[in-house]
C-alpha cells in the first residue's frame, strides 16, 4: 500500500500579499499517517513534521485516493478519481484533456510562479519543464532537493509563488523488502532487540480474497515480503521508521 503525507505552508512577508500568499507544498511518498511522533507513535522521532503539524492543522480523517504512486498523484494534481480519467496504474499517461486543468496550470493562471522539485511519476519520474504549469527546479532525488528548494526561496520573486517539494522517501522501504541498495544511502542493520514489536492485527486475515494470496506467491516484485518471518517484519518496521526520520531531517533543512 502507498500513502502520501502532505504538508502545505502558506507564507507571506507582506500584509498586501495576504490575498495571494506564497505556498509551499511538501509531500512524502509511502508514509502512513501514524508514522509521526505527533501522531502518538513512540517508535520514531519526527521533530520537523511535528513542528509543521503544531503550527497548522493535523487532519486525522483524510484518505489517499489510490494505493499506487501514479494514480494517487494523478488525483492530487487533477482533482479527479484516478479510474475516472484513465490513471488507474503506474505508467498511465496524463490525458491531454487534463493537462490544462492540473493544479500547477490553474495556479499559474491565477498569477503565480509555479516550481516543482523531486518525484513526479505521471508517468515520467520528473515533471517536464514548463509543462503542467511548473518550472522543474530539481530532479527526482531526495539528495539535494531541500537545497534546491532553499535556493528557489532565496530568489527575489515578482509574483507570489507555489513551490512543490516532492520527496521519494520513505518509499525506499520497497528496496529494503527486495534486498536492494537504497538510492540515498542504506540504513544500518539493527539488533532485533531494538526493533519495534508487531501490531495487534499482524496475523494473516483469514478472509483475504484468493487473488491476494495468488499475487503474494506469484509476483515477487509486488510482494517480496511473502516469506518474511515475524523477526523480518520487525526489522522492516525499524527500517521504515528510520526512512521516515531521514526525510524528516530533509524537510527540516
Placement of each model-derived feature along the sequence:
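Active-site nucleophile/metal-coordination loop of metallo-enzymes that catalyze phosphate/sulfate
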Residues: 54-57, 61-90
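Active-site-proximal cap/lid insertion segments
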Residues: 18, 30-35, 39-41, 155-159, ...
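Sec-dependent signal peptide recognition
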Residues: 1-8
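Catalytic-site neighborhoods of secreted/periplasmic enzymes
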Residues: 75-187
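Hydrophobic h-region of N-terminal signal peptides that target proteins for export
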Residues: 8-16
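Short beta-strand segments
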Residues: 27-28, 61-63, 162-169
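Active-site-proximal N-terminal segment of extracellular/periplasmic enzymes that hydrolyze or transfer
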Residues: 18-57, 66, 176
Amino acid at each position: 500500500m502507498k500513502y502520501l503525507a502532505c504538508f502545505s505552508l502558506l507564507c507571506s512577508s507582506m500584509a498586501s500579499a495576504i490575498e495571494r500568499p506564497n505556498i509551499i507544498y511538501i509531500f512524502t511518498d509511502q508514509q502512513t499517517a501514524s508514522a509521526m511522533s505527533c501522531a502518538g507513535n513512540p517508535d520514531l522521532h519526527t521533530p520537523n513534521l511535528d513542528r509543521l503539524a503544531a503550527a497548522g492543522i493535523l487532519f486525522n480523517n483524510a484518505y489517499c485516493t489510490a494505493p499506487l504512486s501514479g494514480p494517487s498523484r494523478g488525483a492530487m494534481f487533477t482533482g479527479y478519481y484516478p479510474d475516472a480519467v484513465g490513471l488507474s496504474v503506474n505508467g498511465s499517461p496524463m490525458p491531454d484533456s487534463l493537462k490544462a486543468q492540473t493544479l500547477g496550470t490553474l495556479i499559474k493562471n491565477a498569477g503565480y510562479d509555479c516550481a516543482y522539485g523531486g518525484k513526479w511519476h505521471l508517468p515520467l519520474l520528473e515533471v517536464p519543464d514548463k509543462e503542467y504549469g511548473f518550472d522543474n527546479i530539481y530532479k527526482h532525488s531526495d539528495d539535494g532537493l531541500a537545497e534546491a528548494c532553499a535556493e528557489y526561496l532565496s530568489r527575489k520573486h515578482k509574483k507570489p509563488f507555489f513551490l512543490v517539494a516532492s520527496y521519494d522517501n520513505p518509499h525506499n522501504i520497497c528496496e529494503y523488502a527486495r534486498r536492494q541498495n537504497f538510492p540515498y544511502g542504506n540504513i544500518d542493520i539493527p539488533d532485533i532487540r531494538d526493533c519495534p514489536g508487531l501490531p495487534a492485527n499482524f496475523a494473516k486475515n483469514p478472509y483475504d480474497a484468493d487473488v491476494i494470496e495468488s499475487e503474494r506467491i506469484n509476483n515477487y516484485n509486488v510482494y517480496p515480503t511473502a516469506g518474511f518471518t515475524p523477526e523480518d517484519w520487525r526489522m522492516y518496521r525499524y527500517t521504515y521508521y528510520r526512512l521516515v526520520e531521514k526525510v524528516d531531517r530533509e524537510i527540516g533543512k
